[in-house]
Amino acid sequence: MRILLILAVLVILLSGCAATDSALPVNTLRQIPREERVPLMVLNFKNSSLKNSANEYQPWEFGIPSMIMTDLESIGLFNILSWERLKDISAQLKFQYQGMVDEDQAVEVGRLAAARFLLTGNFMIIRQTLRIEVKVFSVESGIQIGASAVTGKIDQFFELEKKLVIGMTAYLGTVLTVDEKSRLLQNVETTSIDASLNNYAGEVALRKADQLKVQGRKDLAKELIQQAQAKFEKALEHDPNYQRAKKNLAGLAMAVPMTL
């Protein structure tokens, strides 16, 4: 049963919690060789919003950890566990998804992935106020070593996420300089809520399409890919300069058409 719970973490992650390698930045604040960086895993963030707003902001269960991973990668101190690595672990286990998981199982997955730190959290939106909480675990000891939280107006989500990243870095064994903090705060994906939600809804759709293709359900996968394209286009309507959405849309355009 424990292994099944461990696999559940992997399935949740594979369905929408890890940023794609292509979405991660190339330029970093610190020039540390890749082999010397700290391995780190970021799990999904639970949407704890009230029912009337939960569905609207559901894409941020994927989006917030993706933004966090992008910012942590941009520091140049961490190796973020990739989606492909999680698929490798899942293939090695060869079990089926059942039930929900707790933090103990999540830490166990971190060990399998050879991560040093594990991040998980949740967010809540009430009356246009956004609160994001994150917990930091040491995979080696299996205990929580820190926590951080930010609260503010939802239209400042991009600033809140970056403040959260800055707040958690101390638990990850580093302290950013004033200049590094300033540069991190200035590197904003988008300031548009609608653009962000549409983009990450598209990314979630692509993840689900990948799973369907593996299952041989190509017709449904094609529908999801078309939905993803529409979401990326909608994101760019809200923010024409949204580089992540542009890359996602360009990736679809360059992809080899599915043979049905």
Model-inferred region functions:
Residues 29-103, 119, 123-127:
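Short beta-strand->alpha-helix linker/helix-N-cap micro-motif
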Residues 49, 68, 72, 76, ...:
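Sec/Tat-exported extracytoplasmic proteins
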Residues 96-141, 207, 243, 247-252, ...:
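Surface-exposed short loop/turn segments
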Residues 6-15:
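Bacterial N-terminal signal peptides
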Residues 60, 64, 68, 77, ...:
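Stable alpha-helical elements in mature extracytoplasmic
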Residues 17-38, 129, 140-260:
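C-terminal/domain-edge helix-coil "capping" segments
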Residues 53-65, 83, 99-103, 112, ...:
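Solvent-exposed, acidic/flexible segments
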Residues 1-4:
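Positively charged n-region of N-terminal signal peptides that target proteins for export
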